[in-house]
Amino acid sequence: MEKPSPTRRQTSSLSTISNGMTMTNDNRDTTNTNSGSTSSNNSQPSSSSTPPAASGPVTDRTKVNYVPKSDDPSSFQYYPDDPENPVNKYKFALKADSQYYDPCEESSKLSFQCLERNDYDRSKCQEYFDAYRECKKQWLTARRKNRQQWE
């Protein structure tokens, strides 16, 4: 007996997929028709006058404080992470001994994204690398000052 060629198998599976998709489209059309008739028969007042509750991060640029209102440039922070955050201390304490924990993970991701955007030209992403280094320095100095909090 002769085995069927791979093209025959592919063709038969494609026809099954296209039939399945056609059936799905038919079901969607039926569902849309039913839901349309249901909503037109429904005469209850809608509560669209109430705005939905705001959830998630603040997206309005005018409400975000990028730089603190201080004249001292040493208080400026040029990276999104806060390595001295109690959450970072907790996560660091929970990790296994052989695991690595990076409290400056967001800065690290930003530097990698910059490299990917700029065809891995390191000179264009130097600011991101500097921000990551500053974050790591802050974390290491905080760990050295209060060793017991980080263990």
Curated annotation (Swiss-Prot):
Recorded GO CC terms: cytoplasm; mitochondrial intermembrane space; mitochondrion
Entry-linked PROSITE patterns: CHCH
Biased composition (Low complexity): 19-51
Organism superkingdom: Eukaryota
Keyword annotations from UniProtKB, A to Z: Cytoplasm, Disulfide bond, Mitochondrion, Transit peptide
GO BP annotations listed: mitochondrial cytochrome c oxidase assembly; mitochondrial respiratory chain complex assembly
Biased composition (Polar residues): 7-18
Compartment list: Cytoplasm; Mitochondrion intermembrane space
Transit peptide: 1-10
Residue positions of motif Cx9C motif 2: 125-135
InterPro entries in UniProt: CHCH, COX23, Cys_alpha_HP_mot_SF
Pfam families assigned to the protein according to its UniProt record, in alphabetical order: CHCH
Stretches that traverse the bilayer: none
Role summary: Required for the assembly of cytochrome c oxidase.
More info: Present with 1360 molecules/cell in log phase SD medium.
Family: Belongs to the COX23 family.
Protein name: Cytochrome c oxidase-assembly factor COX23, mitochondrial
